[in-house]
């Protein structure tokens, strides 16, 4: 996948900062909301940013390694949770309804036939990845197809008027995949070994966590640490992770704001960032997950998330919960009076 991504033009920064500073408040009094308003303005290249048709994309895919016992739940939970999303019964559905966010579920590679369903995007690459304990998770052709399909989904959202997209995922075993990706791309540079990055995922007990760590060590011994991020993705990734990476790049290409959820979503961003480092200014990091590897990822990207609520659900729930903060940042910039317009005396 080739991308022509460019970082936002910084020439607007001074004008935006002046506009923020002249609001009726002490300098910096709105804290990180001020930086967020500045970021959205730079992404949209305007002093008066607007949020249009915000949407959450939840990418679902199965993992061959799940059958080896890297998760506390059976693989069938992936398709069952997709059905739950489509029925409106999951946490992400509740939060999207509350925040008035659009929601689409993307079948990137679930081992189930859903048929044509409202709210479901059929982008299936295959019925789950191969078991990376035995072979690469996907072929180069499958990886490239997933990246391109993700890119196309983001472009389609932009064509329909969306300028802010949040990312979520569902896939039993995908915290294991995210751990391997994270270790290969940033773990060694951050002094974090694979065992440190690997967490409990869906709730493994101590014995389950040790089994997961041992299985991932076996996978790493087989596949090694490829230098090319595309090779890392093919070796250990999931179809949902690959498709998210492509969609993130596609969203940034269209000048969209990218809301980053937790550990698995950030593993997709690590791939996207390795392919196009200019993506970072487009990204709003919603929260810090309880997964230990998420802190490693955030540190590697120099990111400070908006919230720390001990979330570890995925689905894009953190992105949805952070949305009102993004709205607040844009709204104060648009609606708050300046010292001049309000006739309020400035600091002497």
UniProtKB/Swiss-Prot annotation:
SUPFAM superfamilies: Nicotinate mononucleotide:5,6-dimethylbenzimidazole phosphoribosyltransferase (CobT). One of its GO terms (biological process) is cobalamin biosynthetic process. GO terms for molecular function: nicotinate-nucleotide-dimethylbenzimidazole phosphoribosyltransferase activity. It comes from the Bacteria. It is an enzyme of class 2 (transferase). Disulfide bonds: none annotated. The keyword Glycosyltransferase applies. It catalyses: 5,6-dimethylbenzimidazole + nicotinate beta-D-ribonucleotide = alpha-ribazole 5'-phosphate + nicotinate + H(+). Keywords: Cobalamin biosynthesis, Glycosyltransferase, Transferase. Its EC number is 2.4.2.21. The keyword Transferase applies. Pathway: Nucleoside biosynthesis; alpha-ribazole biosynthesis; alpha-ribazole from 5,6-dimethylbenzimidazole: step 1/2. Catalyzes the synthesis of alpha-ribazole-5'-phosphate from nicotinate mononucleotide (NAMN) and 5,6-dimethylbenzimidazole (DMB). Belongs to the CobT family. NCBIfam families: cobT_DBIPRT, PRK00105.1. This is Nicotinate-nucleotide--dimethylbenzimidazole phosphoribosyltransferase. It comes from Azoarcus sp. (strain BH72). The gene is cobT.
